[in-house]
Amino acid sequence: MQNSEGGADSPASVALRPSAAAPPVPASPQRVLVQAASSNPKGAQMQPISLPRVQQVPQQVQPVQHVYPAQVQYVEGGDAVYTNGAIRTAYTYNPEPQMYAPSSTASYFEAPGGAQVTVAASSPPAVPSHSMVGITMDVGGSPIVSSAGAYLIHGGMDSTRHSLAHTSRSSPATLEMAIENLQKSEGITSHKSGLLNSHLQWLLDNYETAEGVSLPRSSLYNHYLRHCQEHKLDPVNAASFGKLIRSVFMGLRTRRLGTRGNSKYHYYGIRLKPDSPLNRLQEDTQYMAMRQQPMHQKPRYRPAQKTDSLGDSGSHSGLHSTPEQTMAVQSQHHQQYIDVSHVFPEFPAPDLGSFLLQDGVTLHDVKALQLVYRRHCEATVDVVMNLQFHYIEKLWLSFWNSKASSSDGPTSLPASDEDPEGAVLPKDKLISLCQCDPILRWMRSCDHILYQALVEILIPDVLRPVPSTLTQAIRNFAKSLEGWLTNAMSDFPQQVIQTKVGVVSAFAQTLRRYTSLNHLAQAARAVLQNTSQINQMLSDLNRVDFANVQEQASWVCQCEESVVQRLEQDFKLTLQQQSSLDQWASWLDSVVTQVLKQHAGSPSFPKAARQFLLKWSFYSSMVIRDLTLRSAASFGSFHLIRLLYDEYMFYLVEHRVAEATGETPIAVMGEFNDLASLSLTLLDKDDMGDEQRGSEAGPDARSLGEPLVKRERSDPNHSLQGI
């Protein structure tokens, strides 16, 4: 190599341009890397440099082994080289991968602030002109990309990737580098650097890069808003927050995932850290947990006869497993949200009384049915507790379609030592037993206990956030129950089928209601935690004319005005205190207790509870109507809160009635499940209660044919009727 005389002391370099005096350059594949000085004496000559190695010119500019502050340009040339300025140094370029000596301590790429990225085996296709946290590189070799939150180890030609979680806090240099790039690219002023530092550190503490994983964009922003609210920080808008994320996790992609009409934008390549406190909170879980497992580990359920055609190229073919294996993978993530310690209650004994058994049916058969049905229900509990919902159909088919011979019966159930003949019942014997009214009533009560236990296992707390995958699995399970049971009992008498399906229908309806309530709770939680929305709701609520609402609703509901005023004041006070969802739930529970305590122990308790629900719903609809007519800015928030509180009131009243009657909530809701078979005796009891209350009101009120409350508004000396 020869250096020019004039440019030896100049640190800068400029791109070379051909001069008029330069001879033509012959066509040659030879490549020369030239670095020129910016200031050279006139007349300085450039010596031609011949390179022994001939390289093919790639279409994309490749980085060299070192990065210099000056510009670098590739010049095609042979023996003659452009003489525009004095040439300082010329370097050969070799595009093939080069191995660096382990003893070398020089880094390949040095970024401002002390951050460092080390690449082994080969160079990436391009080096960005700016340095941020988490640079993603992907080549045919095996580069190791070091970032603040994780180490991504890229493989070779098969492009397989694995992530190693790195949970240590980011260094100050890393954060300074990200802030510096944000200031350059977005024009962020320096006085906001402290605020950005808090935001970026929170991102690095709670999230990490991971291949094959995505999170809803809205969930990340909701987590960020919660963080700002807890630490009294001013949040940035959603667009600026997206730039914050991309400044921390380079190479992050955006995908639109979900079903048609219900899709949402997701960040692909990021997930919550396992030790992040957001895993326990999950205040906004509408879609958050859907992508917490890598996508290639969740193959879609397909029929068993098509499993041979499943598979993928390479090592991924073994990941397409059976539905049982898929459920096992999902259940590992969902076990923490269900009550696996639930104790299955004992069944009562059938009350035969003086009932005469049919020919061919003995007490021994009844005892065998008790044992078999108990084991069948225990197996159902085990399957649901393991979240293997698809096994329920097989269990029902096996139990209700046992063969005519005992040897062909449900042999999967072990025989009891107390039953020497084995705890099996042939199908014809089972049909005969179910046709006995005491046996059918006993089986119905057992089903109430069973399905109530399943509800408490799957949804132990209706307000606790659960992953949307678990919620959707429960709803799909509820949707299939009636069809599965009807198909399994197709050969049984219609009365038996109606009795069994009526209970399972109440169970399915309860699952749908509770999952909907849980969904509303998570949506309302974000509203109740938003200070500005709460203030707007309180301002709009103070404009509502509650005197007019009471005037219109009193004729229908006949409620005490003092009770309505107290509820109004308590509601405003709870809203003003910015209470959490759990505090609101406690307040609603106290309202139910206060209203229904006067009916405790009375046969009219269920009727009073239902009337309270109707009155609560009517009053709330009147308030919503007033907000609508006033074009309240917080109408959407009030509508969401109203839906949640109505549904939660239903849940509370349902359990209070079950407690008062000694039944399970499933039994209470199953009472009116079939509108075609409403209990006329229950309706008669309600009518009798109305007549008794009418007689207590006096002959004047009955003669006017007008509710008591409407008349008494003109008589302040008369006490108003209670709820």
From Swiss-Prot:
* Claim: Repeat is one of the keywords in the record: no
Pfam families in the record: BCD_RFX, RFX1_trans_act, RFX_DNA_binding
Read off the lineage from the record: Eukaryota, Metazoa, Chordata, Craniata, Vertebrata
Q: Where is this region: Disordered?
A: 1-46, 292-332, 688-723
Organism per entry:
Homo sapiens
Where does the record say this protein resides?
Nucleus; Cytoplasm
Known DNA-binding region: 199-274
Q: Per the record, what is the consequence of mutating residue 110 to K?
A: In a breast cancer sample; somatic mutation
Question: Membrane as a keyword?
Answer: no
How it assembles, according to the record, is: Homodimer; probably only forms homodimers in testis. Heterodimer; heterodimerizes with RFX1 and RFX3.
Q: Which GO terms describe its biological process?
A: acrosome assembly; cellular response to leukemia inhibitory factor; cilium assembly; regulation of transcription by RNA polymerase II; spermatid development
Q: Which UniProt keywords apply?
A: Cilium biogenesis/degradation, Cytoplasm, Differentiation, DNA-binding, Nucleus, Phosphoprotein, Spermatogenesis, Transcription, Transcription regulation
The entry's protein name is DNA-binding protein RFX2
This entry's Gene Ontology molecular function terms read: DNA binding; DNA-binding transcription activator activity, RNA polymerase II-specific; DNA-binding transcription factor activity; DNA-binding transcription factor activity, RNA polymerase II-specific; RNA polymerase II cis-regulatory region sequence-specific DNA binding; sequence-specific double-stranded DNA binding
Q: Outcome of altering residue 37 to G?
A: In a breast cancer sample; somatic mutation
- SUPFAM superfamilies xref list: Winged helix' DNA-binding domain
The free-text function statement in the UniProt record for this protein reads: Transcription factor that acts as a key regulator of spermatogenesis. Acts by regulating expression of genes required for the haploid phase during spermiogenesis, such as genes required for cilium assembly and function. Recognizes and binds the X-box, a regulatory motif with DNA sequence 5'-GTNRCC(0-3N)RGYAAC-3' present on promoters. Probably activates transcription of the testis-specific histone gene H1-6.
